[in-house]
């Protein structure tokens, strides 16, 4: 499951968790866009996810060429009984819209196969690709659950462009984001806007 490293909790799809539990599948949490996130907070999330049974976590940035390649070896470690021509390792990339699933797949395959863009819902259908004779990778459209339970999560998803612009009021989102930044990163705001007081 690809998550936005800037908002791992908000960008987790509860349906993915239910699906993994029901089918008893190993789960790799990929915190993408880690270059845009607070590294200390990202490390805390990695530690948290790694404590969950049958789950591993990694923080990456698809802008760094070698980082996506680590994912294949992690997937093999999660499913050691797979990875042969008779029992290929099947990996499915899932997540909410616009967290970088298709960009990640292109990086893993080292080809521009999947269409990418800075807006939700670029991928319209599943795309299946044979990496080699023992690995298969499937890219899926972004999946949103029927109702976002926590308003704060909705604001974070809107801020990171994970949901369509018709689903929220931009002014409300800007106010919420401003409040978050004032509380958590006041010094960065002062530096960014070259002010002494906020």
Question: What residues fall within each predicted segment?
Answer:
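Helix-rich effector regions associated with P-loop NTPase G domains
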Residues: 6-27, 34, 40, 54-56, ...
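Residue-level signature of catalytic and energy-coupling elements of molecular machines
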Residues: 4, 49, 104, 139-140
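Canonical P-loop GTPase G-domain recognition
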Residues: 25, 34-96, 113
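Glycine-rich phosphate-binding P-loop
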Residues: 91-116, 140
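Short, well-ordered alpha-helical segments in soluble proteins
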Residues: 75-82, 108-112, 120, 135, ...
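Short, glycine/charged-enriched secondary-structure capping and boundary segments
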Residues: 14-18, 43-46, 72-74, 106-108, ...
